[in-house]
Amino acid sequence: MDQQGQSSAMNYGSNPYQTNAMTTTPTGSDHPAYHQIHQQQQQQLTQQLQSFWETQFKEIEKTTDFKNHSLPLARIKKIMKADEDVRMISAEAPVVFARACEMFILELTLRSWNHTEENKRRTLQKNDIAAAVTRTDIFDFLVDIVPREDLRDEVLGGVGAEAATAAGYPYGYLPPGTAPIGNPGMVMGNPGAYPPNPYMGQPMWQQPGPEQQDPDN
């Protein structure tokens, strides 16, 4: 009885993030198999990202048609003009934004779909997008528009340290030791230069305390 009580007290006082991470991972003899499968999934994601960006670089180098785009340039130009400081926009600027938006959507979809397959589903859901956002530092600007419950579930779901190997490198950034893809001059930056996601595990807003309420009320 004393041992059981001590074990329960230890479990209750442990770090909740560690507890959730452990409960999502099979224990005992199944743990090596889970670790191997998870590692294979991350290696597959790394290969998919490399292939994706290699294809994007080749398409950019071969682009000759600057008039037809997947996204409407008029809409992009209208969004750009929402900034009151923007007076004039050249014809080339919306073209660059259209291509950038297209690549952004494609990569976010690729990362989200990876989470869909991890959960053995065939339909991409909003929590898959939340997973892609929380696993990739460069997407931290999206935390304010990701549904809070999905973001919390993904953080508390125990994203393992291994998941950050491939999933944490955004926009053509490759893990250390990986050969560059495409034109060497087009490989962007160093992934190690990015700090950890400051929004990870933090609430997106805080409820005002009694001292912050309007004194008139």
UniProtKB/Swiss-Prot annotation:
This is Nuclear transcription factor Y subunit C-3. It holds the Pfam family Histone. One of its GO terms (molecular function) is transcription cis-regulatory region binding. It comes from Arabidopsis thaliana (Mouse-ear cress). Ubiquitous. It comes from the Eukaryota. Stimulates the transcription of various genes by recognizing and binding to a CCAAT motif in promoters. Keywords: Activator, DNA-binding, Nucleus, Transcription, Transcription regulation. Heterotrimeric transcription factor composed of three components, NF-YA, NF-YB and NF-YC. NF-YB and NF-YC must interact and dimerize for NF-YA association and DNA binding. Residues 1-29, 198-217 are annotated as: Disordered. One of its GO terms (cellular component) is nucleus. Residues 1-28 have a biased composition (Polar residues). The keyword Transcription applies.
